[in-house]
Amino acid sequence: SRKRNKFLIALIILLVAAIIGTLAYIVVKNLNENNERKSLDNIAGSYASGIENGTTSATEVTSPSINVKKVENPIDFKSLQQQNSDIYSWIYIPNTNVNYPVLQSHLDDNLYLDHDIYKNYSFSGSIYSQMCNKRDYSDRVTVLYGHNMANGSMFATLHRFYDADFFNKNRYIYVYTPDRKLTYEIVSAFEY
């Protein structure tokens, strides 16, 4: 009976420790995610100040064959690329939280799966493409990768496109490069 009591006490202590450890992990993870989201918002505010207020003036391109004239770009690519030369474009989707730099590593296709624009570990990672895609978006298909974060960052708000009314009112994705603005029409939204 005494051995059984010691065993039960040890089991209870172990369970309590596991619960405390799990709760601590969840709290720290949520704090880190929220800090990362604030950092991402600061990046958008610092380097892409002209996008959300409708003052975008970069040349709009919908086809590579169109001749374009270069005008002022709302994205400060010079400052961004001083931070990290892997930053090559910016994606913005109105009425979502998607307003981020796009990166591509020349060494590791999935580096930015779990690294921020400063190449530090980041649970939410960054928006990125792999080396098989050209940085000028001249490929027939360019795949951009990003997490579906519970805190609403990265590509989490793309779920809004499941709502037909939202979909019909928000039909465009804007991608900025240092020399042009590309506009893509959203023709379908589905869960993969």
Name what the model sees in each region.
Residues 21-192:
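Solvent-exposed, non-transmembrane regions of membrane-associated and secreted proteins
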